[in-house]
Amino acid sequence: MTVSLRTSALSLATALILSAMPAAAQEAKSKLDEVLARGHLVMGTGSTNAPWHFKSADDKLQGFDVDMGRIVAKALFGDPDKIEFVNQSSDARIPNITTDKVDITCQFMTVTGERAQQIAFTIPYYREGVGLMLKSDGKYADYAALKSAGSSVTVSVLQNVYAEAMVHAALPEATVDQYESVDLIYQALESGRADAVATDQSSLAWYMTQNPGRYKDAGYGWNPQTYACGVKRGDQDWLNFVNTALHEAMTGVEFDFYAKSFKTWFGKDLTPPQIGFPVEYK
């Protein structure tokens, strides 16, 4: 074969390979296309942790995580009820994503570097932290009063190896009483054995909504951690879509849906997004 013929043959082969590449790329469809074709979203979450994901009196799944899934379903189909929930343990959150058992997981999952190597996190939908709850008619008005009281203050907290260090990060001189259940830490405050309860801000907010006027937030939070949904790595179209749905729920056309959920589960009214220049780009 002459040089010119070999060159022509190579050129033809290269052209055939290049022409086939777009078709091959089109075959690798996004999870977005799969979900749209199926007609409903499949979301992994739990069922035993109020106010995030738990059963109502009539056995319906509800909570803030559940509502985040409904936001995505509404963005997909115009209907927040076009969603199937897969009940899963915390340990199953990542495996169920990587094995395609679910399209997405929203289950008060803390964003960490280690987890981000295994799955793709969406934009955050909540910032958790530790807070302090007081009795409304108690002797301490707020966090400043607690801190000023020094060693006179007793704080009830759920028993764990980090409990002392966690409380002392905010109240260095406080006495720390550890209990085996969440119910007991609240009972300690109610009975007067403790002056304050230290636990997740979301748990305190939920408890206060269930007991209006009886308790109050001390006005200080620490130990921040970010909650985000998780999807499978390597599918930018799907990640972009979910991020868009969550972003617009927190800042745009679906804000009322997000704000209503926030009020229901945390008892707080959110300020509507500022009109004009998008604040997230300042």
Feature-to-residue mapping (PLM):
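Extracytoplasmic small-molecule ligand-binding "clamshell" domains
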Residues: 26-105, 117, 150
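Ligand-binding cleft/hinge of the Venus flytrap
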Residues: 55-58, 70-81, 147-149, 163-178, ...
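Beta->alpha turn/N-cap motifs
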Residues: 45-49, 86-91, 100-112, 136, ...
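Short helix-initiation/N-cap motifs at beta->coil->alpha
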Residues: 30, 83-95, 141, 159, ...
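Periplasmic-binding protein-like
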Residues: 47, 126-137, 201-246, 265-282
